[in-house]
Amino acid sequence: MKNNRVSRLAICVVLGSSLTGCTGDAGPAGPAGPAGDAGPAGPPGPSGPPGEAGPPGPPAPAIDASPVSDAPIGKSPAVTIAGATQTAGFGAPVTLVGTASDPDSDVSKLTYKWIQTAGPTATLTGAATASLTFTTQTLAAAKTPVMAQLHFGMLPISPDEAGNYTFELDVTDPEGNLGKATASVRSNPPTTGLQDVPVGIRQFMMGDGGAQTTWNWSLDATAAPGSAAILTGASTQFPSFIPDVVGSYTLTEAVSTKTLTMVAGNWRGEMMTYQTECQTCHNDKIAPDVFTPWSKTNHAIAVQHKLNGTYSDGVTPLTSFPRSCMECHTVGDSPAAVNHGFDDVEKTSGWTMPTKLQPGNWENMVTNYPALADLAGIQCENCHGPQDGAIGHLSTAHTSSGNTTPAKWTRVSFSEGVCASCHQDATHHYKPSQWQTSAHAQRDLVSNATFESRGTTAAHCGRCHSAQGFAAYSAQLAAGDATLLHKPDGTPADEAYLRGLGLQTSTVEAITCAACHDPHDASNPSQLRLGGGLKALPNGLTNIVDAGKGVLCMACHNTRNAEHDDFVAAATDFSGPHTPSQTDMLYGFNAYFMPRLNPSKHLSVTDTCAGCHVAIPTATEKAAGQSDNHNFQTDDTICASCHSASTDGEAFLAAMNAQLGDLGTAIGSKALAILNALYTAGNTLTVRTYRQATDQYSSAAATTPDLLLAAAPTAVVLRSAIHGTTSFTLTLAAPVSVAWTATASAPAVTETLSQLDCQISGITITGQTAPPVPPATTGAPLPAIATNSVVAKASWNLQLLSNDGSRGLHNPSFFQNVVVKTLEALQ
């Protein structure tokens, strides 16, 4: 017990800061002391039931989860261009001044960049400044591609030639904000080249070129009362002036002594009134009714369907038809002049271009803006010039076609320039540009179609070598008449008729748009003058059917000189096949030693000729975004559209050329053998030779061959036809002296030659015997080679194959069989 007590006594208690000592045994318990301080909080009790939801709190701030942008800060500069739309002239300096403002930056810190977006390539000065300068191309440069096709008269200008230069000005501020503006500069509004012109539009003339190198023009405006017109460029080939009032203007070029009369007027528009104003006379009684067929062409509906939201078929949806299209789709739409054109009436009418192309737009124009609707569509005036009814102006539309200097040529032109004034515009209107590189555009054969060069025989050449002649001839063919071009009553064409058609130097045109396409009639596809089939062709082929559009090509691309084969009477002359023999080749027709018809598989091509030569673009045209081909040439791309790409066309052509060479050699050898046999038999050989460079003969008449040959030739080679007659080149054993007969264009000269070119009819014999055909006649000049001899027939066949130009591609099996059969006949 003691130890326990000691242990208890050993306990020290600290109270505050005092130390108590040890105490004795505890006394009895005292009364309870006062309550002590509260102890620390206990652990939390269990959760109570959830309380009611409180009111919604404020929205949380939005969080941008997109990537961080590096776009410029601020607004783009506002940009304008002084002279943004202007007509500057050809070879003229142009200045475009840009002005920019920027709400965020000092304008001195803006940067400028001019970009040419369309038009002829121009040399730009100041392209990195606010002010751009350049010079438009000259008129001569613009017309270079077609210069050889032009002649004295009015000068047409297409939209492409007018030089539609477009520019974009980009202005950038220091923060990278970009502002833009555009400008458009033309050298001149497009013109048709007609002598009937609108008031207020600058017109250009063209003087003779070639040997003429100086010009002296003058303008007489006395028949245009009140005119203050000024002629510019009077000493150049291309003078111009703006006809400023209604009336007649006469231009004279003193060096060539040629004159030109131009009639100026304002536009009239007759879309809604032609039935009453025009068809009173144009009713097929007083004058031809061209209006009824014209009303069914795409020209007549060039606006109405498009405003209503479809293409010309009235079905296919059209999504774009901007106001700028009205320049070609209406009458006289040109801001360059005030002459009652579509734009002039539009300004006063209150009409505005619809913002949406939809049904009812055209009807709205007709109902509420009839004066404007009168000028809508492509009408008579688009292609024939203004018809405002001014004294002396309306009358230019009416003239006799028999007039040798018809006034109608002020309003009628077959020039492609009339069509190109709309249809030659950048990438979507390119057909004239294609045509300009074609053989149809060349004028080297056009002179053969004029009365001045051919007299009445222009009826032969003019039917296919001139636009006017073919337009008349195609009507004959459509009626089943394949004879020479003649008057409507069937009598032979005379000077008055040929000049009235336009087959004279001042008006004749090459094979232009209007030669093949009838602007007044859509009866045939593509408004072609012929379609589908023909009763006859001048090569003797009859009943052509299912040729499609290609039948138009066949009208001229045939041998033309009647049928020559073993199924008709023997030939009585040496006429060769006319040069374009493509139709004969396609049908396998007109060859001696062969069945009468040997048709090509290519006749199954849709539209025959046109299926390959028009419908499919070449590789070059396709690369330019063009969908057809009015150059009419072909390439491997076109062939590959049907044939395997592995087909080696060049190897094929080389093989065919070799066969032609073999045939030519065989013909020459056979002819030489005949001439040698004649000499051996004691005959004398006489030749009338020809000089192609100057178109001269060694004697004045074909019946008087003049060169007596001392010996037979050492070689004979078939050459190209001389004036349509089968011809040879003779190599002589000894040179001879040739005196060329003078002509109107070449003097008489003498030269020594060892080779002579001559028509086969110009090789004659005189002596003891004659060839088997014709019968022997002692002493009389006779053809050394008969018209129905194997040499004459073989020569025809070779020319038929060669003149086709395709080297057998049009009809390979026919080509090869003709060669084989002709070689067999020559043995």
Predicted feature locations:
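Collagen/collagen-like triple-helix recognition
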Residues: G21-A71, G179, Q692
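Proline-centered linker/hinge motifs at extracellular inter-domain junctions
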Residues: P61-I63, P67, P72-V79, L110, ...
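Surface-exposed, proline-enriched loop/turn segments that connect beta strands in immunoglobulin-like
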Residues: A65, I81-T85, G119, T191-D196, ...
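Short, solvent-exposed loop/linker segments at the N-terminal edge
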Residues: A71-I73, Q86-A92, G193-I201
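Extracellular acidic, Ser/Thr/Pro-rich low-complexity tracts
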Residues: T99-D106, A118, D173, D208-A211, ...
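Solvent-exposed loop segments of extracellular immunoglobulin-like
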Residues: D106-K113, G210-N216
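Surface-exposed, flexible coil segments in extracellular/virion-facing regions
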Residues: K113-M154, S218-F241
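Short sequence/structural segments immediately N-terminal
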Residues: N164, L169, G176-K180, R186-G588, ...
